Amino acid sequence: MKETPKKVLVIGSGPIKIAEAAEFDYSGSQALKALKEEGIETVLVNSNVATVQTSKKFADKLYMLPVVWWAVEKVIEKERPDGIMIGFGGQTALNVGVDLHKKGVLQKYGVKVLGTQIDGIEKALSREKFRETMIENNLPVPPSLSARSEEEAIKNAKIVGYPVMVRVSFNLGGRGSMVAWTEEDLKKNIRRALSQSYIGEVLIEKYLYHWIELEYEVMRDKKGNSAVIACIENLDPMGVHTGESTVVAPCQTLDNLEYQNMRTYTIEVARSINLIGECNVQFALNPRGYEYYIIETNPRMSRSSALASKATGYPLAYVSAKLALGYELHEVINKVSGRTCACFEPSLDYIVTKIPRWDLSKFENVDQSLATEMMSVGEVMSIGRSFEESLQKAVRMLDIGEPGVVGGKIYEAKMSKVEALKYLKERRPYWFLYVAKAFKEGATIDEVYEVTGISKFFLNKIKGLVDFYETLKILKEIDEETLKLAKKLGFSDEQISKALNKSTEYVRKIRDQSNIIPVVKLIDTLAGEWPSVTNYMYLTYNGTEDDLEFSQGNKLLMVGAGGFRIGVSVEFDWSVVSLMEAASKYFDEVAVLNYNPETVSTDWDIARKLYFDEINVERVLDLIKKEKFRYVATFSGGQIGNSIAKELEENGVRLLGTSGSSVDIAENREKFSKLLDKLGISQPNWVSATSLEEIKKFVNEVGFPVLVRPSYVLSGSSMKIAYSEEELYEYVRRATEISPKYPVVISKYIENAIEAEVDGVSDGNRVLGITLEHVEEAGVHSGDATMSIPFRKLSENSVNKMRENVLSLARELNIKGPFNVQFVVKDNTPHIIELNLRASRSMPFSSKAKGINLINESMKAIFNGLDFSEDYYEPPSKYWAVKSPQFSWSQLRGTYPFLGPEMKSTGEAASFGVTFYDALLKSWLSSIPNRIPNKNGIALVYGDKNLDYLKDTAVNLVKFGLTVYSISELPLQGIETIDKTKAEELVRAKKVEIVVTDGYLKKFDYNIRRTAVDYNIPVILNGRLGYEVSKAFLDYDSLTFFEISEYGGGI
């Protein structure tokens, strides 16, 4: 019999960070839906302003607060929930739940943990307890010993025997974990590993070099009934974090005995921790025989469970929430099939491939090798009916400029077999591209296996693609059968045209004449054995007929955001879902095209039709041919939609909203600059230089500093502010190729200016706009900036000029829908630096801060016009809202933390307050590892920029109760100094509570910044922000903890 609590508190995961991303927006949203179906009142604590779940329709009450125990206690004290769910917000939520239990908060207020209980969570997440639990239940684990100190770790490593894997307890994304081949390796890194554990514990485990890694997803109810939902095979062997691995489902290389044995072990692991809900179990399999070890389990929804849910069509999060309420598996209906109960295990008649997406080129000094710590910022998932088709589709989905496994930049690069094998041995990201290159250059299967440990089954498949492509290259024409085979192997029109040295139009014409078109197949969880009631689909060339009939009428295709990367994250999924809901009022049918397994937009019950497939011109045209969509919307999914808008329009596609030609003007720097001049709108001086002489001439005219934007990057550092000739020419020489083909854009950098933005909607005549002001000065990328609504330091005169500029642009470009304009304001004069004719990164924040959904307003603007009389309208603010960036420095091994014009943050948090400082502090505290410093601790404050702000920061921190040191090489007037070596020692000894610094000082303070982030010490990288946060510390006791609507926010 199920229990029905009246009110349930759901804990979210906070801002997006590496290893804890949008999968928890998906899982949390599903949990809230499952609770609402039962008539249970829901309360959500989550500071992630960009997510779908922090919209009002999901939870009855929403608290945008730091996801930490003391803030959640305030909510419990006020709301008095009967139950709490901690399994849908990642490791962050589990840690909060354990803390609330240990501190007696749950017991004090009579709050029951729903789902897996705290003792089960501790058994799973403490490496020592997990090992003991497995041994007690006769389940196989690798030889290992736990440790809580450096000395104990070194001693136990000798007992276990090198090489060893160091695993970290109560940890996210493998932070601090490593493979130590020698005692020297271990001594060098063990302190960092212990620092990254929530409970200060690590496991020293025998390293299983080149063993196969596998994952099983299992559901279990309170009666012990279990269903194994998916088996996921990692192509990367042990030693590479599962979040860094390319994976396939279902498993491709297991025989039945291996599969069944591990399936049985999975159910036993779930039983041993008394799981109620869902968990994933990770295994190591010896490729040379029937030998397996259990590695770990996660007793919560995870990245893998989100993937399994999207791969199988089984709604894991929804079912898990129902089980947490006391339902049994046979009582829950699978809403994808609409017929089967949740105890039916999925059966797949297709192959799913997931590939992570990295953005390591944005970070200086970062270690490029894939290892035990997760560094990828997103992932893509493809579906095909052969491994080759699925893999090639996934490669294109990465949006890294590769047309597939073969035929791209790496495949055609000047690279020898030896070089390709070297990159493979180093475990570079996107290894499959180097595997193909190695085969092209003559490597054997055995040679590639030796350096990678990747199963020969998969290597043979990739070699087959290389052989086929090389055969294509010697053809003068392509016959129908060869073209069919190419498409079945996942080759795009672009790849085929490159091989034949023809145009893509030529290949498409032959396809059309021969009727070689993909078919639409349904994902129904049971391989077509039962009819599906949801339209969850993919396209494949390995089939003969469509699984459904296509309706007629007024239909819209929406382009999603694709795989997340730095700059494109969950905020664009919020825009896609918002547009989907708004568009349903204007269209008979709305379909979504997207391929991100983490998101709400790719969930089974969000869209009327979901195409889980590629986002490119070829695929959109295929879908239009089948579905006869009247419009395509490209503006809600970030840059990926804008990048194909013009070509779609050229192919006769009608775009919803602003025209492709207007988008092209906004995206093209020269065209946009001429437009601004025509309208009399100020912009920073700039030049597109094709030689060093042109650069020198421009710099002599405008002076330093200047902002450099190369069009062709060699070193991975795309933009830089140069303060001197030496700095500028050294950067241009080192970082970029300069020529008429690859011009470098140099613009005047306006110092000590305020950066501001307008998020808005236009109907071509009027504008609805929201002004956002940055705390940091101009020069810090808007994605890394702290933002305030309403504005604080801008004058009314400046804001009025900004509004006039925005209105002029909206009318001139006939903007229909959402847009974002970025300004630099100096001496009350706004200068436009950028216009984006699409939904923006900040739009969920500005919408929720003002209580008005800009995407909903966009649809009104497009079809009915904006419904107010003013030319320009900005809704009033009732209270304060502040958005803060979330950085993932600790995950990015070796990189130097600093802020500049290149975006580095992975997510964002926001909070509301009765004052600016109330909102700012809660927002800042929502990003890990930020926390209130312990009084009587030490702060380091130093830098070479914003010196007045740094000095005032130091004064505030002294008032707060800290001992503040500056560094003797960079002294601050009136602040005690210590030398750099002493500062490094204090950080390494974990005696420093907070570091506040400013400027690019890599040669001077690399060790201070890097050690601080490695040891989870809060670091503020801007003097102005440091000043505002230090001032907020002084009012810490005045923080407010209201529900979002009490601040006048929320949508």
From Swiss-Prot:
Reactions catalysed: hydrogencarbonate + L-glutamine + 2 ATP + H2O = carbamoyl phosphate + L-glutamate + 2 ADP + phosphate + 2 H(+)
SUPFAM superfamilies: Carbamoyl phosphate synthetase, large subunit connection domain (SSF48108), Glutathione synthetase ATP-binding domain-like (SSF56059), PreATP-grasp domain (SSF52440)
Domain of life: Archaea
Keywords, ordered alphabetically: Amino-acid biosynthesis, Arginine biosynthesis, ATP-binding, Ligase, Magnesium, Manganese, Metal-binding, Nucleotide-binding, Pyrimidine biosynthesis, Repeat
Residues involved in Mg(2+) 3 binding: 822, 834
Record text on cofactor binding: Binds 4 Mg(2+) or Mn(2+) ions per subunit.
Binding site for Mn(2+) 2: 296, 298
Binding of Mg(2+) 1, residues: 282, 296
Residue ranges annotated for the ATP-grasp domain, each copy included: 131-325, 673-863
Annotated Mg(2+) 4 binding sites: 834, 836
Region described as Oligomerization domain: spans on this chain: 400-548
Cofactor(s) demanded: Mg(2+); Mn(2+)
GO BP terms in the entry: 'de novo' UMP biosynthetic process; glutamine metabolic process; L-arginine biosynthetic process
Record keyword Repeat present: yes
Domain MGS-like: residue ranges: 930-1051
Residues given in the record as ATP 1 binding sites: 127, 167, 173-174, 206, 208, 213, 239-241, 282, 296
Positions contributing to Mn(2+) 4 binding: 834, 836
Listed GO MF terms: ATP binding; carbamoyl-phosphate synthase (ammonia) activity; carbamoyl-phosphate synthase (glutamine-hydrolyzing) activity; metal ion binding
Allosteric domain, as annotated region: 931-1051
Subunit note: Composed of two chains; the small (or glutamine) chain promotes the hydrolysis of glutamine to ammonia, which is used by the large (or ammonia) chain to synthesize carbamoyl phosphate. Tetramer of heterodimers (alpha,beta)4.
Record-stated family: Belongs to the CarB family.
HAMAP family found in the cross-reference section: CPSase_L_chain_A (MF_01210_A)
PANTHER family the record matches: CARBAMOYL-PHOSPHATE SYNTHASE [AMMONIA], MITOCHONDRIAL, CARBAMOYLTRANSFERASE FAMILY MEMBER
Name of this chain's protein: Carbamoyl phosphate synthase large chain
Species this chain originates from: Saccharolobus islandicus (strain M.16.4 / Kamchatka #3) (Sulfolobus islandicus)
Name of the gene encoding the protein in the UniProt record: carB
